[in-house]
Design a protein with these regions (language model features):
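Extreme N-terminal tail/first-helix region
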Residues: 1-18, 138
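Short secondary-structure boundary/capping segments
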Residues: 10-11, 36, 56, 110-112
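Short, surface-exposed beta-strand-loop junctions and turns on beta-sheet-rich folds
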Residues: 52-54, 73, 136-137
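Charged, gly/pro-rich active-site loop segments
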Residues: 2-4, 76-138
Length: 138
C-alpha cells in the first residue's frame, strides 16, 4: 500500500536531488542509473526518454528502488521502494522544469531530434534511510 511522503522527504526531492535508480532487466539483474529527482504529491518522479533501459525495464517489471542523498547533510539519505509507471503526459514540460532547477536553463539542452520524453511516477511502498541528524524521516 502506498505511503504518504513526509514533508521533509518532499523538501529533499524538491532540492537539487540526484537519485540512484535501480530497475531490473529481463534476466532479473539490477540496472543502476543516476537521474534528477522530483516529487508530485505523494509520487516520487524522474524524467527519462523512450528507448532507454529504464522505461523498458519498468514496463516489464514495475519494481523500483531509488536512493537519494541529502546534499546539505551527507549522512542523511532516503531509500524509496515502490512500483513505477511510465507516462508521456507532461514529460516535455517536466524535463524543462528539471533543466531549470539543475542547469539553470529554460529548456533541456540535450534533447535529441524526435526524442520522446517520459515521466516515471513511483508509488512508494516503503521509505528507508535516515533523515537529518540520523533520525527517521518524518
Amino acid at each position: 500500500m502506498p505511503v504518504t511522503l513526509p514533508h521533509s522527504v518532499k523538501q529533499l526531492l524538491q532540492d537539487k536531488a540526484y537519485g540512484h535508480v535501480v530497475t531490473f532487466n529481463a534476466q532479473g539483474k539490477p540496472q543502476l542509473t543516476m537521474v534528477w529527482m522530483d516529487v508530485d504529491g505523494d509520487e516520487v518522479t524522474f524524467n527519462t526518454a523512450e528507448g532507454r533501459n529504464k522505461p523498458q525495464n519498468l514496463r516489464r517489471d514495475p519494481r523500483i528502488i531509488v536512493s537519494v542523498q541529502d546534499r546539505n547533510d551527507p549522512q542523511a539519505y532516503a531509500v524509496f521502494h515502490g512500483k513505477a509507471r511510465v507516462t508521456e503526459t507532461g514529460a516535455d514540460d517536466h524535463i524543462d522544469k528539471l533543466a531549470k532547477r539543475f542547469l539553470n536553463a529554460d529548456k533541456y539542452p540535450f534533447r535529441r531530434p524526435g526524442e520522446k520524453r517520459l515521466i516515471v511516477r513511483i508509488s512508494v511502498d516503503r521509505i528507508g534511510g535516515f533523515g537529518p541528524k540520523m533520525q527517521p524521516w518524518s
